[in-house]
Amino acid sequence: MSSRYRVEYNLKVHKKDAFIEWIKGLLAVPFVLQAGTDSGAERTYKQYCSIFSDIENLVSQKIEIQNRRRQLGSLEEARLDQLVPQVGTFFTHLPLVEAFEVQNRRRAICSRKMVSPSFNDIRHILNSAQILALLKSKELKLVTFDGDVTLYEDGGSIERGGKIVTRIITLLKRGINVGVVTAAGYDDPDKYKERLYGLCFALFSDKSMSLEQKSKLTVMGGESNYLFQYFETSEQFGFKSIDDDEWVPSSVKAWSDDDIDATLDVAQTCFGELSHLLALPSKCQIIRKKRAVGFVPGFIFDDELEVNVKIKIPREALEEMVLVVQKKLESYPPAQNIQFSCFDGGSDVWCDIGGKDLGVSILQNFYQTDSPITAAQTLHIGDQFAPKGSANDFKARSAGCTLWISSPRETIEVLDDLLPYL
């Protein structure tokens, strides 16, 4: 296996994004022409800045046209939409030149002679630009997080003393609403207390914070199906369920149970058929919940180690299952009457009713019922932003600003960029 193959394939962890790939192509030209020359780094820096300045202007133009289309019904098309048809909605201007300068100091992008600006370089630049934009606006009111691979490792939890704990508490102390929008779907609030125990314990132990500040922490479980809010008494702490009448939108209340059950039935049948077709181990299981169905790895006995070990489902099989189920449901009439989300969780596959766009939107309304928090005042941090199919954070792009991270360590890094200036 060649090194290039390994590098390109490993990028599938973040699934290629059309906007990032387009920027990557623009930056490749000055890199090829200038790298290795006597004045290469300086000239490359100037050309990169010029490119990012042009992209900045294209984003600003797109926002202006978005506003005209919304307010005046204009049919005008932005130049950026013509160049990158898959590009989504922008809610803030992006200071890309300033963000590039930040990341160039950290990653020495212009000093490299053999490796051109990569997918991850550009991802970090876009993250920095979004942070800078929110800081300049001074309007950030809601920060939402994915769970696995964002706040903690896949299948893990927030431990006592974890680095992420102090960062989230700082957000709460500064009056920012914080929501954990996770695919983990439990109707029992104690399950979320277990996953977020280190954070809950720290909140309970912090006597300098008011209960009002602490109650700004919520959990949206099953992407958009269960809402819980932090609470404490003199002896207890954890999460309490919020009554459906206080947060479930009327549009969601209109979904019929028959359509929901039929959609999950089809997904469940597909998982079963694909399990046989892809020759996956019989120990793998299909789990059916009230508003979700998943295909998860089981355990198999390792004769050499003499212990049960978790089955590893091949990445290709996970992606195949997601895309097949997604395509099947897109043409299934009952599924068109509701919202659903199919995604690859890294070691398993799920089909949920609802989606993270809906989950974030619900929190925007829950925190400010009379005047909902806007997309430009919202920041969602997650690790799954693939443009289609296998990533559930992607939908959150339509509900607010986003940061694309790849690990809990990166979550801490972006919060460290944000918090000192809030």
Swiss-Prot record:
Residues where ATP binds: 106, 124
Lineage start: Eukaryota, Fungi, Dikarya, Ascomycota, Saccharomycotina
Positions annotated to bind Mg(2+): 146, 148, 383
Pfam families: ISN1
Activity regulation text: Allosterically activated by ATP. ATP binding is a prerequisite to magnesium and substrate binding. ATP binds to 2 of the subunits in the homotetramer inducing a closure of these 2 subunits and the release of the C-terminal loop, thereby activating the enzyme.
Protein name, entry field: IMP-specific 5'-nucleotidase 1
Family: Belongs to the ISN1 family.
Molecular-function GO terms, alphabetical: ATP binding; IMP 5'-nucleotidase activity; magnesium ion binding
Protein source organism: Kluyveromyces lactis (strain ATCC 8585 / CBS 2359 / DSM 70799 / NBRC 1267 / NRRL Y-1140 / WM37) (Yeast)
Function summary: IMP-specific 5'-nucleotidase involved in IMP (inositol monophosphate) degradation.
InterPro entries, per database record: HAD-like_sf (IPR036412), ISN1 (IPR009453)
Cofactor(s) in the UniProt record: Mg(2+)
Record-listed IMP binding positions: 146, 148, 154, 182, 348, 356
Assembly behavior: Homotetramer.
Annotated EC: 3.1.3.99
Top-level enzyme category: hydrolase
